[in-house]
């Protein structure tokens, strides 16, 4: 399973979820689903925006986990 590491990256960079929410300009519902890995898809433009805002390569936004670790 692939999941987004947004919360971990925010913690590493000492930013809040609210800070990122304001930067992303998404509805809170869509933003929260993305951040909490409750979505099955994400738009490429949102990935690009995340990468720029968090100043990290797109690949760093993801991690692969075993299904048992859910």
Report each predicted region and the residues it spans.
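The alpha-helix within a helix-turn-helix
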Residues: 10, 21, 51
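Short alpha-helical DNA-recognition segment
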Residues: 15-33
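A short, Lys/Arg-rich alpha-helix, primarily the initiator
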Residues: 1-16
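The DNA-recognition helices of helix-turn-helix-type DNA-binding domains
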Residues: 27, 38, 65-68
């Amino acid at each position: 399973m692939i999941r987004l590491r947004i919360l971990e990256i925010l913690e590493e960079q000492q930013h809040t979820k609210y800070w990122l929410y304001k930067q992303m300009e998404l509805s809170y519902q869509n933003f929260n689903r993305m951040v909490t890995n409750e979505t099955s898809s994400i738009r490429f433009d949102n990935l690009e925006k995340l990468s720029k805002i968090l100043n990290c390569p797109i690949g760093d936004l993801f991690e692969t986990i075993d299904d048992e670790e859910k």
